[in-house]
Amino acid sequence: YATSAVRDAENKEDFISEVERLGIDFHVITGETEGKAAFLGATYEMKGNDKFLVIDIGGGSTEFSYGLPNTIPEVVSINIGTIRFVEMLREMTYEQLEIHIHEMLSKSKLLEKIKQLNEEYELIGVAATITGQVFINKKINYNPKISHGYRLSIEEIKGNFNELYNMSESERLLIPSMHSKRVDVIVPGTFLLYQILTFFNKNEITCSEKDLLEGHFITTYL
């Protein structure tokens, strides 16, 4: 499956043709499909009547999925993502990026509705930009048993950003869990996560190691 990076690529059709030529079964999924699968994967084992807002930060887009466990959620895909921000930061400051993020979030009727609700709901974060914050904060190697279910505070996220922002890429590589392909995108990704919590006036987000892949498996085989 391919997500935002391929959906938005100028050479999307050429890329798909080349992959199919190799005999690989390949599908480009919509942001809505991506969000629904991530929501199902993250909430499948949840019980009760609590609502969840599942957040999946990607390279080109971020999916927000809202609803009760084991139901079809309301989904919106916003074109804010880590790779997209790396490119934008070549021409703007983080102060300008903050304004841009909040403007993009505010344009969504669904997100504005959720923001104004008086009902209780919990944030769940999936994918490496969010779950990886745990290991950056603790300075340890990746271990899903530690990150799954971890309640990540907004203070931890802000602390991670301040630390990462003041590091060179070579210094970030010394963080035990840091992958070489993430040394540039992790900084704007952490900033985006912080701004999302600020937008919804939330103090924490629960990390989940179960997301899109688990959601697809559940819908296909269960």
Give the role of each language-model region.
Residues 59-66:
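Acidic, divalent-metal-coordinating active-site segment for phosphoryl/phosphodiester hydrolysis
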